[in-house]
């Protein structure tokens, strides 16, 4: 690991597996690193306040997440963040402002996301019952991530976690 700990930013659409992979990564790394914290996007929204779910509201919320991660990282914490925040403005900000930033894109095809639809977001959005769903009526910017993990098949969680650990030399 570099002199400063990483900010590991897992991004992907709702239901792609960010939280599952992020939590598994946290559980594995906390055995080795005491200066580790896990920040879930949904939980941070509860803590930091509800912003609008439109594109600009999502960007504003993502910037708050990034600034909070930076605050913790500047104090020596390794930070794992799981968040949708799939906008070029966020990628650019993070690459410029966050030290030891490592971006992981959890990719999953839309058909599979609709099949999973854990929160009912995609079904409701496609039926025009709700709006402001990233990937349906809010376009997203696919990141040029340091690592892309295809999670269209929800298998091999341990292998995906080990791949991240290997890439970061943790």
Swiss-Prot record:
Coiled-coil residues: none
InterPro entries with a match to the protein in the record: APS_kinase (IPR002891), P-loop_NTPase (IPR027417), Sulf_AdTrans/APS_kinase (IPR050512)
EC class name: transferase
Pfam family name, one: APS_kinase
One GO MF term attached to the UniProt entry: sulfate adenylyltransferase (ATP) activity
GO cellular component labels: cytoplasm
BP GO terms, sorted: capsule polysaccharide biosynthetic process; sulfate assimilation via adenylyl sulfate reduction; sulfate assimilation, phosphoadenylyl sulfate reduction by phosphoadenylyl-sulfate reductase (thioredoxin)
Catalytic activity: cytidine 5'-diphosphoramidate + ATP = cytidine 3'-phospho-5'-diphosphoramidate + ADP + H(+)
Function: Involved in the biosynthesis of the O-methyl phosphoramidate (MeOPN) group found on the capsular polysaccharide (CPS) of C.jejuni. Catalyzes the ATP-dependent phosphorylation of cytidine diphosphoramidate (CDP-NH(2)) to form cytidine 3'-phosphate 5'-diphosphoramidate. Can also use other substrates such as the corresponding adenine and uridine diphosphoramidate derivatives or cytidine diphosphoramidate analogs, with lower efficiency.
CDD domains to which the protein is assigned, alphabetical: APSK
Keyword Magnesium on entry: no
Annotated keywords: Capsule biogenesis/degradation, Kinase, Transferase
Phenotype of null mutants: Mutant does not express the MeOPN CPS modification.
Family: Belongs to the APS kinase family.
Protein name: Cytidine diphosphoramidate kinase
EC number(s) given by UniProt: 2.7.1.224
UniProt source species: Campylobacter jejuni subsp. jejuni serotype O:2 (strain ATCC 700819 / NCTC 11168)
Pathway note: Capsule biogenesis; capsule polysaccharide biosynthesis
